[in-house]
């Protein structure tokens, strides 16, 4: 199986100032950290990628048409993302700090697609898990694999041939609920909390440094998860967080209203920055104001 080939090396999805429509494009400045530039209010321009408008369109071509970013979106829409698979405890030091045995096999759980928000979105802490300190709202910086073509029963040697690109995520977790049960999907699926940003077609530099200490690296992960089932194009895989999460710190560090959370992965992916907001719930009272 030949590796995926495309005309872009970095891809963003955005609403353009010029058209007020959603486009995909390649940032003109190859060295720009798009997420950080967005946070600093800088102008971001991209060459429009012409095709079906989807990052999954392998025949799409980078044009010379320049567009300016008004709103930065996830690199794939919710409709394009087939499944959100996640690995837990995939770094030995993180497993140790959490006082959990290092897994012998990938520790898989799923998140609902409805938990996805874009890089311009707010991390909303739902009222059901407030106050945050009691429910232990935590952050997890993770490297994300984006699958570009159907993969089933893939060997480790050919696993990278199915990778469209890599992106960053912040897997927001509520530790009180996570540690109360053996299945983590409930505690990691509240509201719109999981964040993705831009894709980079690379597996070198900082991505290697980010993943070198993984128990199950990218090749092992794709091969294992494809056995007996199909990883469809548009599937994303969160590969776990390194050590340093909030709930193991002394004192613990939990997310709260007004916090800014920044996740950085190199190799063209860059910074993911979002603000935390606690959900405000209003109740009607018999028709009187």
From Swiss-Prot:
GO molecular-function term, one example from the UniProt record: metal ion binding
Use of this protein: The availability of a complete eukaryotic luciferin biosynthesis pathway provides several applications in biomedicine and bioengineering.
EC number: 3.7.-.-
Highest taxon in the source lineage: Eukaryota
Keywords assigned: Hydrolase, Magnesium, Metal-binding
Annotated family: Belongs to the FAH family.
Subunit structure as annotated in this protein's UniProt entry: Homodimer.
Protein purpose: Caffeoylpyruvate hydrolase; part of the gene cluster that mediates the fungal bioluminescence cycle. Involved in the recycling of oxyluciferin, a pyruvic acid adduct of caffeic acid, to caffeic acid. The fungal bioluminescence cycle begins with the hispidin synthetase that catalyzes the formation of hispidin which is further hydroxylated by the hispidin-3-hydroxylase, yielding the fungal luciferin 3-hydroxyhispidin. The luciferase then produces an endoperoxide as a high-energy intermediate with decomposition that yields oxyluciferin (also known as caffeoylpyruvate) and light emission.
Protein name: Caffeoylpyruvate hydrolase
Lineage of producing organism: Eukaryota, Fungi, Dikarya, Basidiomycota, Agaricomycotina
Name of the coding gene: cph
């Amino acid at each position: 199986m030949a590796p995926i080939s495309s005309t872009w090396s970095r891809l963003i999805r955005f609403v353009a100032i010029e058209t007020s429509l959603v486009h995909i494009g390649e940032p003109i400045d190859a060295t720009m950290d798009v997420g950080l530039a967005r946070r600093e209010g800088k102008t971001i321009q991209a060459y429009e990628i012409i095709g079906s408008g989807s990052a999954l369109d392998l025949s799409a071509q980078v044009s010379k048409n320049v567009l300016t970013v008004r709103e930065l979106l996830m690199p794939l829409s919710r409709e394009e993302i087939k499944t959100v698979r996640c690995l837990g405890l995939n770094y030995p030091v993180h497993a140790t700090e959490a006082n959990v045995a290092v897994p012998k096999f990938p520790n898989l759980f799923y998140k609902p697609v409805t938990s996805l928000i874009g890089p311009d979105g707010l991390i909303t802490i739902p009222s059901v898990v407030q106050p945050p300190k009691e429910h232990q709202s935590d952050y997890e910086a993770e490297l994300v694999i984006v699958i570009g073509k159907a993969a089933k029963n893939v060997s480790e040697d050919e696993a990278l041939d199915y990778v469209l690109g890599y992106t960053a995520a912040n897997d927001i977790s509520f530790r009180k609920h996570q540690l109360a049960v053996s299945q983590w999907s409930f505690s990691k699926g509240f509201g719109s909390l999981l964040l993705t940003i831009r894709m980079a077609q690379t597996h070198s530099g900082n991505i290697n440094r980010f993943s070198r200490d993984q128990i199950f690296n990218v090749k092992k992960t794709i091969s294992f998860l494809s056995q007996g089932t199909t990883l469809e194009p548009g599937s994303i895989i969160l590969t776990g967080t390194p050590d340093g999460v909030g709930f193991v710190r002394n004192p613990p560090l939990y997310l709260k209203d007004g916090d800014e959370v920044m996740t950085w992965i190199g190799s063209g992916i860059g910074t993911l920055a979002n603000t935390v907001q606690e959900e405000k719930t209003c109740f009607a009272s018999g028709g009187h104001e």
